[in-house]
Amino acid sequence: KAEALKKLHFDEIKKLIDESPRTGSSMPILGMQNLNAEVVEYIQKNHKRIAVEKIEPSFAKDLKLKYPDDARAVIDYQAINHILKEHKNLSFEDIANYRELSKQANETLKLKDNQNRPLVASFKQINGFFVVVEQVSNAKNELMLKTMYKARGDYRDSLIYKRTLAKSQNSN
């Protein structure tokens, strides 16, 4: 399955990010265990992007990614900037957990974004709150973090869920 990635020190992580190609199969995999609030902040402040992990090949096939056996989940500074600016109740720590939240989602919907790219919207209920993680696939064989929201209540009652559900049913 996925290769075991060791836990790195922050200096090793910075070096990996700084020396990483910006795209392609030679971009190293950071590993979810190495993505924390400090690393998310470093990516944002230094205008970087990095592959967090490889995506499950069957999931990558569903998204019509060109090379499903080597598809990557990628985070970049633009998504982090957008989330922190538009959704002020989310922190670097929340963003660092985006892959875990999307994998453990109560519900995941597949649809197209406004540029007709495959989009995955994952809804995770956490006590009286819910978190939405949106990831979009691109031509570079990547599933990019697009945005995140956090709101009170049950996700199934939210306008964002109802709109996303309607769009996902129309794009099938």
Residue ranges and their predicted role:
Residues 1-172:
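Ribonuclease/tRNase effector modules and their secretory precursors
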